[in-house]
From Swiss-Prot:
Enzyme Commission designation: 2.4.-.-
Lineage: Archaea, Methanobacteriati, Methanobacteriota, Methanomada group, Methanococci
InterPro entries: Glyco_trans_2-like (IPR001173), Nucleotide-diphossugar_trans (IPR029044)
Protein family membership: Belongs to the glycosyltransferase 2 family.
Record protein name field: Uncharacterized glycosyltransferase MJ1057
Glycosyltransferase keyword on record: yes
Length: 290
């Protein structure tokens, strides 16, 4: 571990592996240039062979002593990497950022003030801009505030939370941690366990994050990703089922994911490719229509 840290108000946690240099620099700079200055920025490099990323992080660290750098000796995965940062995080709150996303300048200031003024809130999110590889805004993500007050109902009905927009009480993340056995969906699993523990969610109805959507993968990669996503959704739900026995929305997501997973496993690849092509064409037509 490299760097020093007093007790800041907020610790920012970032895990990086092989994100493009441009994205990594933009992400680091977005934290260093926050209007709120009292924070520590813990960056974990999960690829010990990525010498360029190490060089970039150390260059920023020389200019900003708030940056704490950890290099894993081997690839541990995002969950374990984030947990290493969480273990040394200090202060009342932890903010998450991924190494290809951008925190808008007042993110930490506004989230910290909101948490301080609403002490009953445990996890706080924000509105998000979805951006492309060049930083162009693709979509605005604006979930309604009232849905966070009924999180047990709406969390399983629709997409409400974007992980790198989260600020959470340190004691909660240190207690629950990310499940390191999950390759995917560690954030989803963490949120389900927070809901099971009756922690309170909320959202600031302001845009405080730019969330990067990568270029569209080829169809084989997309099939693999959807298969993995469905599998780990099933695994996460099954693991936490005792807390949601009577939650009909929880079980709807479970059975929907089961159907999707079985469909992908049992359907010939060439048919899946045809269905993906049809979906892409519909998306193009819809986009042109707007």
């Amino acid at each position: 571990m490299v760097g020093e840290m007093d007790k800041p108000l907020v610790s920012v946690v970032m895990a990086t592996y092989n994100e493009p240099e441009k994205y990594l620099k933009e992400s680091i700079e977005s934290i260093x240039n926050q209007t709120x200055k009292d924070f520590x920025f813990i960056i974990v490099l999960d690829n010990p062979n990525n010498k360029k990323a190490e060089e970039i992080i150390k260059e920023y660290q020389q200019k900003d002593k708030r940056i704490i750098f950890i290099k894993n000796e081997r690839n541990l995965g995002r969950g374990a990497s984030r947990n290493k940062a969480v273990n040394i995080a200090r202060g009342k709150y932890i903010a998450i950022l991924d190494a290809d996303d951008i925190a808008l300048p007042k993110r930490l200031e506004k989230q910290f003030k909101y948490m301080e003024n609403n002490r009953d809130i445990d996890l706080l999110f924000s509105w998000v801009y979805f951006i492309d590889e060049n930083g162009n805004i693709l979509k605005e993500f604006k979930p309604e505030k009232y849905k966070f007050k009924e999180i047990k109902k709406y969390f399983f009905k629709e997409h409400l939370t974007v992980h790198p927009s989260m600020m959470v009480k340190s004691k909660i993340l240190k207690k629950l941690k990310y499940d390191e056995k999950l390759i995917r969906s560690q954030d989803y699993d963490f949120w389900i366990r927070c809901i099971a523990n009756d922690y309170k969610f909320d959202i600031i109805e302001e845009f405080l994050l730019k969330y990067r959507i990568p270029n569209r993968d080829n169809y084989l990669s997309r099939i693999k990703k959807q298969k993995l996503y469905s599998y780990y959704t099933l695994k996460t739900h099954w693991k936490n089922k005792k807390h949601f026995c009577n939650n009909v929305y929880f079980w709807k997501v479970f059975f929907y994911s089961l159907v999707v997973y079985l469909f992908i496993v049992l359907t010939p690849t060439f048919i899946l490719k045809i269905l993906i092509d049809i979906k892409d064409k519909k998306t193009e037509i819809s986009t042109k229509g707007h």
